[in-house]
Amino acid sequence: MVEVKKTTKTKSTEEKAPKITKATKEKTSDKTALKAKTPKTKVSDKAESTPKKASVKTSAKAEKINVEKTEKVEKVNVEKVSIKRESSSKDVQKADFSNIKELNSKIFEFEKNYDQAIFDCILSERASRRQGTHKVKNRAEVSGTGKKPWKQKGTGKARAGSLRNPIFVGGGRAFGPSVNRNYKISINKKVRLNALMASLFALAKSNSVLLKTFSLEKPSTKDLVEELRKINASNLKRILLVSDDKNIFLSARNLKNVKVTKVTSLMIEDLVAADLLILSNENIKYLEGLIK
């Protein structure tokens, strides 16, 4: 009997032991799984929840920014349109100067376009304005001794014969500009005439030529401005007035948008840059004489 009890006890212990280990293992595994899952799920929930909130905020902000941008763009466009309208009204309505019927001269019938001739003439006009009075001293004119600075050999330095050499500080200038240099560029008469006629035709085509004779009793800038205001030309940027009257020349000296010149000294650059050319019938006759 005793032996049987012992065997039963051992059996029961052997049977109970594995059951406890399995349960504990399952429980521990479940606990570890839960522990491992819980923080990850929390982090994932946070990570999933935060971008959603951020996306809503960013979308709302983006919508606000887009609305503000569209409003700004609309405002800017309206301002630009208004500026354009103002500029068109200020540009003195070039269509008002369309006196093509009065411009029956051969000068304004020169339909050929000589861009290269105009370019060459402008270059020659600009070059002729250069005085060429620049001057620098060469090695013969600069002050200094003519003594050899150090002996030819034995010093380890490069050989030198004079301290007035252009390589030294205080030496003369090598190949510097000389006195009274002539910068003029010669242009053929036919080329200049073609450029003149082409520029006049371009002004007539754009309705920028006005036939009118200006005359003032005395030099007065105020009176000249009034005369220009009568023809709606006071707001133009560049007005080229061809006249021999000294009073008009003195009256226009203080006006930055008006240039007075004689017919004999018309420049191609002034004609190309002019918004309005004011001529008299006498000036047209002189220009017609150049064509013959």
UniProtKB/Swiss-Prot annotation:
- Alphabetically, which GO biological process terms does the record hold? translation
Annotated transmembrane regions: none
Q: Which UniProt keywords apply?
A: Ribonucleoprotein, Ribosomal protein, RNA-binding, rRNA-binding
> Looking at the keywords, is rRNA-binding present?
yes
- Start-end of Basic and acidic residues biased regions: 1-33, 42-51
A Pfam family that this protein carries is Ribosomal_L4
User: Coiled-coil regions in this chain?
Assistant: none
The entry's family comment says: Belongs to the universal ribosomal protein uL4 family.
Task: Tell me the NCBIfam families matching this sequence.
Answer: rplD_bact
Describe its function: One of the primary rRNA binding proteins, this protein initially binds near the 5'-end of the 23S rRNA. It is important during the early stages of 50S assembly. It makes multiple contacts with different domains of the 23S rRNA in the assembled 50S subunit and ribosome.
Name of the protein in question: Large ribosomal subunit protein uL4
Q: What is the originating organism of this protein? A: Mycoplasmopsis pulmonis (strain UAB CTIP)
This chain is encoded by the gene named rplD
